[in-house]
Amino acid sequence: MSYINKNDLSINSTLYEFVNKEILPGTDIKPDDFWEKFEKAVHELAPINKALIQKREKIQKKLDDWHKKNAGKDFNKDEYTNFLKSISYLVETKEDFKINTSNVDEEISSIAGPQLVVPVDNARYAINAANARWGSLYDALYGTDVIPGEKGSTFNKERGDKVISYVREFLNQVFTLKNEDWKEISQILIEDKDLVLIKNGKKDYLKNKSQFVGFNGKKTHPTSILLKNNNLHVDIIIDPTSEIGKYDKANISEVIIESAISTIVDNEDSVAAVDAEDKVKCYRNWLGLMKGNLQANM
């Protein structure tokens, strides 16, 4: 393991080369400038971190000593609470307050949905999580036991029909029509700003028209319809030429649902990154996610 001496820093050569050759290019930051300012940050913040760690160790020792001293005694909640307060492990309860935030992404502030946690050292997991915001509802249902019966080694049309029926019922519940059933719709189009659904030549509309967000394609022949409920979107794909769409009454070939809203890319609890090589692997995966060029073999 070799090191590069830079001013008052000793830098692992693997990390040094990674920063200089992979991170900094394209940022307009010169390597010498980066390491100079990084050195300043290290020497400014390291003593603060060291003091905090020492404080934590002192508190932990007091906790350990108390439990050794009181081993075998009946537990006294009030006594223990007062002890925790005396070592500043607990602080006095303050008055209720609210935090006012601004400029926070909707994914954090107002959209309720699943959040994934993935280890950054596993490129395949990280890529899957990054792409998990949108997923096929058809695929999800076909591949799980939500739909009863065997999947088989080849496409099971009977199972596929059950999936489509299930999704239509989902649309009935979430994007209810004024009069009709999604299962009976034979054509979808747009008139003015309204989503129009047709059964036997008769027009129907969403009970809540505000759920219609937009479309792709022509108004008379849209290729996708975007709907929204509780700030979560569903993209209905219309393709009469696809294997599914050409047999579907309304030529719906796919239903894409907004799923995992955000992802925590973990570089701590689920990752064992000890030496520089481990850490560079993690940093390289993170860099690939930020640049959008991370790849993994399946």
Residue ranges, per PLM feature:
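Catalytic alpha/beta active-site cores
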Residues: 2, 82, 88-298
